[in-house]
Amino acid sequence: LAGMWLVEDEVSKAMPLPSHYGVDDFPIIIQDKRLDNFGVPEYDPPAKGGFIGDTLLVNGVQSPFVEVSRGWVRLRLLNASNARRYTLQLSDGRPLHVVASDQGFLPAPVAVQQLSLAPGERREVVIDMSQGSEVSITAGESAGIMDRLRGLFEPSSILISTLVLTLKPTGLLPLVTDNLPMRLLSDQILDGSVVRTREFRLGDDLPGINGVIWDMSRVDAQAQQGTWERWIIHADMPQAFHIQGVSFLVKNVNGAPAMAEDRGWKDTVWVDGSVELLVYFNQVSSEHFPFLFYSQSLEMADRGSAGQLVTQAAPTLG
């Protein structure tokens, strides 16, 4: 089971974006499962990697549709799958306009034809439903007939259907249709210099992070509130990585600049090779209850790919 908190503040409430819950603003929780002949979920932990199912569920429903108002529609996306990453697109080729990521709004909307969504990652998109008829969001190619037959005899990692959601516009187009704002937030300005660089390798054949499995009695990293660090994350196999209690910016992915849709504040990132993060420690932890950083692939975290982070309060000036 998975749920979603929608956290608003004065900035988000003032944004000229759809905000009528259930009319033009919808939470979308995506999961892959494996169901038996009676529709009951089956789970067999893999020896390596993470669990991959063959049935796509959205808000607990297979191949759902929703009636939406004509105009802009806002979808708040969450990948709540154990390990599967999705590449989302619209069936008629119209763009997805990305407006927010894990921890807040992007500086400006980013129009994309395809949008990746890693386990644990959150994104917000808006879609123009003012013209045309219904449109579907899909997540890649569905299993062919031979794949489906093979799936009757052995577990399959190929999705039976890649239909995420169908949007069906209803009603009349408003007399006035707002355009998307050109800007959402001012550009991110780094206040302060990087005080330290750390490197972490997420293993699988050798479980753990940097060859060490999680130990609740051990602190793996210490930092000070209000400082910046450079974290370089390597992965032996593609997986998502999450850090609690921080906000970070993706500086580069395998040596290339981050995609425009990944330039907002984040706490979860897909690692396929190496990524470089600029990590800002904005929250104080407790020595008794440290923050965690870990593989967002559920089974890999269970096998020990996690570490503990203590963030100490900034010194007071007296």
Which sequence ranges carry the predicted segments?
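Beta-strand cores of secreted/periplasmic/IMS beta-sandwich domains, seen most often
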Residues: 1-28, 62-91, 121-141, 186-202, ...
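Extracellular/periplasmic metallocenter environments
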Residues: 1-15, 113-169, 238, 261-318
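Alpha-helix initiation/capping motif
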Residues: 9, 18, 176-177, 181, ...
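Low-complexity, flexible helical/coil segments
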Residues: 20-28, 44, 111-115, 277, ...
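Histidine- and aromatic-rich segments of cupredoxin/plastocyanin-like copper-binding domains
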Residues: 30, 37-185, 190-191, 255-258, ...
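Short, solvent-exposed loop/turn elements at domain surfaces
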Residues: 35-40, 86, 207-211, 241
